[in-house]
Amino acid sequence: MRNTELVQWFRQSTPYVNMHREKTFVIMLDGNAIAHPNFINITNDISLLHSLGIKLVIVFGARCQIDELLAKNQMSSTYHKHIRITDSKTLEVVKQAVGGLHYDIFSRLSLRLPNSPVLNVVSSNAVLAQPLGVIDGVDYGLSGKIRRINIEGIQQQLAQDAIVVIGPIAPSVTGEMFNLPFEEIATQIAIKLKADKLIGFCDQQGILDSEGNVLSDLHPREAKRYLTQFIESGQYHHSAARFLQASIEVCHAGIKRSHLLSYKEDGSLLQELFSRDGIGTQLSEESSENIRLATSFDIPGLLNLIRPLEEQGILVKRSREQLEMEISNYTIIERDGIVIACAALNHYPEEKMAEMACVAVHPDYRDSSRGDVLLEAIKRRAYKLQVEKLFVLTTRTTQWFQERGFVLSTTDDLPKEKREHYNYQRMSKILILELSQ
């Protein structure tokens, strides 16, 4: 990365550093992620998150390691309704696999970068299990489910600046150990902690569409469809499927966002959390973008957006004081709290006209539909004001407005006040759109 790119990325990431501080994230790590060579980088990035003041709970699984040990010992296990039936011999293998991963996670998190503090990593026995019992005539043996979670204990450990690590085996009130699905543990801990995010890893960079493109945003309804596809294709235990199952449930329970990333790509965790568009799939009932009326709190973001365009002569220069006076005229699109597009509606009630002014879209989004979204929002505001004609003055985007129904006009067609202040040095093109009421 060149120095300029590093500086640009660091500046862009700063709002997210502040946004995530003191938040609680639950991270799902299955056995495939832990076994991959990139896991050392994932743990380094987890350590970095902790150093930035993020509270972390790691819930890990061990399915592939259990399968390997069973095969090595010439043992097999059966499944019923996608759940492993665990007898006493199988449980010993499960303990061995889980214990090994537990040690790996602790040792990796203990590897410090130069001049970095020692991490406080703790193993939690906060989960109390109970047997699944007999279902449909099938005895699940030592396969269990959650009976209770000591959330207060986890909260105390997080308050003491610890990273909490929880595995997929847990004791019952009788002292027996049970094998639990790790996604169920992650789901319930995230819900009961009221975590801010659930984060999972798989072998691809999120959920892919039919053409192999990463879906950056996914609604729970769509997530259910992709989960069904995994199940119907016999991939119920695929990392992405298990994450979808967990994320759909936590989303319905009020966890605002879940993120699915690749465990193969170095830095995917940081890119997802500290960049505007991320790199994986975000699952949320709410869009990461919001279109709304601007307030005085948005003025710094508006200035950052329009200043480069003013310096290029594309927009007329506006002072901070002018923005403060006219802020109620502005409609903005924000993404993760960052203003990425704006437009103002200046009303001329006597002529039943209004101007769409100060139209700006962040360079990263100019090839998208944000301009159209702004135009529709401005038109809706104009309709409410009973505006009959919407006009724009532009030096660079004449064709864009013409493609959307605006017609070239002259200064004679402008409202009297606007006509008297028309800047003949800029010689902006005048375009008018008739609004049908």
Curated annotation (Swiss-Prot):
Gene Ontology MF, one: L-glutamate N-acetyltransferase activity
Residue ranges of every copy of the N-acetyltransferase domain listed in the record: 289-429
UniProt-listed InterPro entries: AceGlu_kinase-like_sf, Acyl_CoA_acyltransferase, Asp/Glu/Uridylate_kinase, GNAT_dom, NAGS_kin, NH2A_AcTrfase
Catalytic activity of the protein: L-glutamate + acetyl-CoA = N-acetyl-L-glutamate + CoA + H(+)
Major localization listed first in the record, in broad terms: cytoplasm
Recorded superkingdom: Bacteria
Subcellular location(s) of the protein: Cytoplasm
EC supergroup of this enzyme: transferase
One Gene Ontology term, aspect cellular component: cytoplasm
Annotated TM spans: none
Listed EC numbers: 2.3.1.1
Keywords, sorted A to Z: Acyltransferase, Amino-acid biosynthesis, Arginine biosynthesis, Cytoplasm, Transferase
Pathway: Amino-acid biosynthesis; L-arginine biosynthesis; N(2)-acetyl-L-ornithine from L-glutamate: step 1/4
HAMAP family from the UniProt entry: N_acetyl_glu_synth
Similarity comment text for this entry: Belongs to the acetyltransferase family. ArgA subfamily.
Protein name: Amino-acid acetyltransferase
Organism taxonomic ancestry: Bacteria, Pseudomonadati, Pseudomonadota, Gammaproteobacteria, Pasteurellales
Gene: argA
